[in-house]
Amino acid sequence: MPSTLRPLLALSRRDALITASALTASASLQLGAAHATEPTNLNLPTGGPSMGYVTTDDNVQIFYKDWGPKDAQPIVFHHGWPLSSDDWDAQMLFFLSNGYRVVAHDRRGHGRSSQVDSGHDIDHYAIDAFAVAEALDLSNAVHIGHSTGGGEVARYVVRHGEPAGRVAKAVLVAAIPPLMLQTDDNPEGTPKEVFDGFRTALASNRAQFFRDVPAGPFFGFNRAGATVHEGMIQNWWRQGMMGSAKAHYDGIKAFSE
């Protein structure tokens, strides 16, 4: 087994707790906060969050958040399409309050990062994540990726997981690997026509498409008896519309194929 894949395996009890917390937090997709009836008092460290930009080798500005003690174990969050690092805010606050250093970045063309016309593929996503990890000198990090972010994590671990000690564990939440697209070798995948529909909807009316997705299947608000939280829908829409239409269009191929 390649040594770069070993961090994906063999969770200790402590690692399992991190994984379970991340899975629960991501699966709920902020529903817990939406349903909260009592204030939650988090034990957050003093000093305040920090943020900044990292410049990649191809001159792309990648926005990042870096919260918590710099000597604590880092947990690095990788967001899904077409969102930003803001999608992990609730989870970052949770782990920050439990003593971890938490880091997240906006993928190129997403959020506050540069809106460039190229490099919207998994290889570049992983390279950009590596640029952030290098700039912040992250080691022994737990990488958590949701959806497209899961593909980014898998590629990051394989391509940039060495030297030993850089990556402690990887958590893939509802991730895209190994392949979403239906092919002869992947007959249970999603037909290409579905992704073509995404492209058509995005190109014709991105704003409405990004309203319909969270209002319907993304949070399960289209299910019978579901309680709809308008703030969550608007926050999803806000994150999506911050990014580049070109990055989002190209990203459909990146996450599906």
Enumerate the predicted regions with their spans.
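N-terminal secretory signal peptides
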Residues: 1-11, 22-27
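Conserved HGGG/HGGXW glycine-rich cap/lid loop of the alpha/beta-hydrolase fold
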Residues: 60-115
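Conserved alpha/beta-hydrolase catalytic His-Asp/Glu region
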Residues: 178-190, 200-257
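N-terminal cap/lid segment of alpha/beta-hydrolase-fold proteins
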Residues: 40-61
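Glycine-rich His-Gly loop
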Residues: 77-80, 147, 175
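Twin-arginine (Tat) signal peptide motif
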Residues: 5-17, 31-32, 108, 113
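Flexible "cap/lid" loop of the alpha/beta hydrolase fold
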Residues: 154-204
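Active-site loop/oxyanion-hole signature of alpha/beta-hydrolase fold enzymes
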Residues: 57, 97, 104-148, 158-164
